[in-house]
């Protein structure tokens, strides 16, 4: 288990404030926060690439001090893929992965490379030079190379940043397979909460230098006490009913004669569903998901999860 205790870090201003975090093998933990929240710095501290101002790091119960000298990526079974990862552009996909385990016996090394090519869907481009493949394929090669030496933990900084929706879905599957097949603990940083909802076992939110407790994906999605935080994970409606302010997700409603009346304005087809833009009688805009466009005027009843 990677465990961080009382971690604080400042540059010109405090970035991380007395944080606690832990991730076990076989767990995918998502770290979500806005750009500039300190997520990348926290990931580097986990990897031993940066010292905190204060705090302690434990790997499988063993305290690591000083961090940067002892906690070298790979040395304690930790691998990291930064946002600005680099491949050898003139080596093939297979060679880029193979170079990470040149110290392995040949037969074992060859078997491992073949497994990773298959796991990450890279068989078709295995002999292609790295600079000739797509950004999504390069991302998968970088992750395959990072885990080639069978690290116990994998740290990923914004792995979905330059991928389209289809490739994001495929990468999510590869990471879940990695967790399930090799019992790898994964910490995944993202500023887009929707990227981690269907992937992570637990999610923590980094905001104003503080790290939240671990939430399940369902709990964090339907937790509205902090609307700004909730909006990190998808559209959130806010309307006034009588004297109460009500928050609800676009899927938390039914068509009902007993509900409030809304007027249809526009609709976008997104991911197999229509995102309907409607307005309430108080002229508040509301987003509603449906399998079809809503008609001009409907009554909706909010059903809280």
Sequence positions of predicted segments:
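Helix-to-loop junction immediately C-terminal to a conserved catalytic motif
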Residues: 47
């Amino acid at each position: 288990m990677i465990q961080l205790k009382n971690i604080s870090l400042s540059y010109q201003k405090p970035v991380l404030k007395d944080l606690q975090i832990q991730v076990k093998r076989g767990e995918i933990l998502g770290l979500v926060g806005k750009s500039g929240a300190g997520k990348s710095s926290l990931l580097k501290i986990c990897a031993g690439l940066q010292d905190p101002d204060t705090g302690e790091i434990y790997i499988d119960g063993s305290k690591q001090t000083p961090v940067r000298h002892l906690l070298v990526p790979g040395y304690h079974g930790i691998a990291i893929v930064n946002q600005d990862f680099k491949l050898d552009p003139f080596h093939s996909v297979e060679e880029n992965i193979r170079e990470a385990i040149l110290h392995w016996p040949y037969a074992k090394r060859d078997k491992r490379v073949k497994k990773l090519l298959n796991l990450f869907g890279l068989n078709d481009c295995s002999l292609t030079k790295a600079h000739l493949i797509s950004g999504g394929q390069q991302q998968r090669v970088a992750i395959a190379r990072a885990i080639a030496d069978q690290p116990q933990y994998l740290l990923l900084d914004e792995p979905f940043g330059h991928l389209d929706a289809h490739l994001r879905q495929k990468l999510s599957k590869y990471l879940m397979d990695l967790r399930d097949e090799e019992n790898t603990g994964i910490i995944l940083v993202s500023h887009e909460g929707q990227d981690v909802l269907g992937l992570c076992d637990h999610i923590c939110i980094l905001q104003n230098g503080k790290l939240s407790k671990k939430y399940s994906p369902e709990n964090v999605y339907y937790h509205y006490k902090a609307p700004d935080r909730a909006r990190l994970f998808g559209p959130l409606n806010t309307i006034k009913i009588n004297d109460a302010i009500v928050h609800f997700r676009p899927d938390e409603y039914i068509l009902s004669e007993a509900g409030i009346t809304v007027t249809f304005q526009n609709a976008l087809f997104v991911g197999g569903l229509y995102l309907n833009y409607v307005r309430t009688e108080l002229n508040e805009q509301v987003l509603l998901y449906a399998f079809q466009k809503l008609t001009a005027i409907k009554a909706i009843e909010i059903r809280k999860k």
